Amino acid sequence: MVNENKKRVAKNTMMLYLRMLFYMAVSLYTSRVVLQTLGIEDFGIFNVVGGVLSMLGFLNASLTGSTSRFITFALGKNDYSLLRKTFAGTSNLHFGLAIFIVVIAETIGLWFLNTQLIIPENRIVAANWIYQASIISAFIGIAQMPYSSIIVAHEKMNIYAYMGILEVSLKLLIVYLLIISPFDKLISYSFLYASVSVLINFMYAFYCHKNFSECRHKLFWDREFYKELLTFSGWTLYSTLSWMFKGQGVNMLLNIFFGPVVNAARSIAFQVNSAVKSFISNFSTAFNPQITKLYAAGEYTELYQSIIQYSKISFLLLFFLTLPIFCLLYTSDA
């Protein structure tokens, strides 16, 4: 059993790393081409407008962690009725949250976009189109999040990897379409980008409905169930708020004080930073379901051994990744 789990984690990690390497290579390339095609100012506008909606996404980030944990826990207990209830309940919460965020985005968010951000007057209309495309993408993305959690809980990392590779391949196609587009390139890019996001999310939902019988929607009210889920989400709310202010909050301040050109520079640096962090997050995605399932099954000895082993591997992965960077900084100072 232990060896099987180790082999599964190793295989899943390999699949996620292949996904990440492909994703990183294509993303860095497309960022450069999109920057050249849109221009510095429009590129900055695209990122800062999308950032307004990302600031509202901290609620989704905290709820997503709880969704993944509760679905994996139910799967680890081999309790099918609990699994179906958990999926249906988390789907209801995510759909309600998606509607709530759309309402806030179309009121407070829209006011903030048009009155507080520094956007050239001749690009205000384009910025509003970007914003609406981002709202569509965000609504679909939030509503489908339980499907992603189901795939990870079942440790179908190959599907997760294939979807990621397909997504970046479509984004690569977007770059070509953007270059030849006769329309406003900023508006075209925002809707093409949103279309890819919507398509991938629908493919996640289609796969889950076809392969996992627990993926069935049902409206129900269970006060204790929702209370437990939301209470667990509250513990992650503080960290997601901090990351949100550190990321998109700084982006908003840079725009207000320095304009969209500085946003363009930071967005490129932010993408490189995210690519580096994805090395460890991919490994965590591979072993987190195992940890939760072992805890749910009451196999504590194997649980502790796995935690120690995975912690060592995480440290080594991060060490070998950052060592060349520290060496480069040290030699450049010398």
Region spans (language model):
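Conserved small/polar residues in nucleotide/adenosyl-binding loops
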Residues: 330-334
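Membrane-interface junctions at transmembrane-helix termini in multi-pass inner-membrane proteins
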Residues: 139-166, 176, 187
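Alpha-helical transmembrane segments of multi-pass membrane proteins
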Residues: 107-111, 120-144, 161, 165, ...
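Interhelical loop/hinge segments that connect adjacent transmembrane helices in multipass membrane
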Residues: 1-9, 186-190, 204-247, 290-305
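Signature of the first transmembrane helix
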Residues: 8-73, 102-106, 172, 231-261
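Hydrophobic alpha-helical transmembrane segments
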Residues: 19, 132, 161-177, 181-210, ...
